[in-house]
Amino acid sequence: MVDWIARSRPAPARSCRDALWWCRDGEAPRYERTRQELEAGLIRTIEGARGRVLLGFDFSFSYPRWVLDALGVDWRGLWSLLTEEIVDMPEWNNRFDVAAELNRRATGEPAPFWGTPRASALLPARKPLLPAGCLELRACEAALRPRPKSGFQLWGAGSVGSQTLLGIPVLERLRRRFGVELCVWPFEAPERRIVLAEVYPSCLPKALWSGHPVPDREQVLHLAAAFRGGVDFALQQVGDEGGILLPAGGPEGPALDCIARGKA
């Protein structure tokens, strides 16, 4: 399980909170200073693994349906687009420029993406109004409790949108590298050796990491353990918005045809 982050600089040499952490069930969590180091570590782990591998990432694998329609892409097209546009280096990335370009392509206005230290004509610092009838959350996100932040917010307290912009290109590179060995759930049937899935650590009881000096570390530790019993990948209908994989006994809600669970 992976706790992703959108730092624009390498994390400190000494492990800390608000950084990149990942964990295999039964092992101690690992700390990485950059996304590039983590990507390399994931590749080594996959290549060295015996049997099947489930990789869970805590960022959105897609956007609300209307955004995909406006961009003229399905989930594969979105992943390819972001991989082509995003430049991510240890001390710099262009995520705000890419978000502004996505706004131009999707609406021609400074929406839906927002949140930046330096506002521009196509990327505002504050939350904009969305076009009429356009939703802020995917169905799988709206069903969760606690409800997650919007993937459109890139900057500010609790923002998660930058993680998606910088994370999806890593997933796409894994997808291209491992080819027919790898599938992306729930867009593809989870029948291959390597399965990528979106997870939501905040569904776990906060008491598991409350008061811990590095809560990120504890989140991946407990999330990896939560899927120890296996996964029931069965879903009803899933489109290009995707779905979320939760541990057994997660939150209940009205739109759970886009959510699957681990086994108790």
Where are these regions (language model features)?
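RNase H-like (RuvC/DEDD) metal-dependent nuclease/polynucleotide-processing core
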Residues: 4-54, 59-264
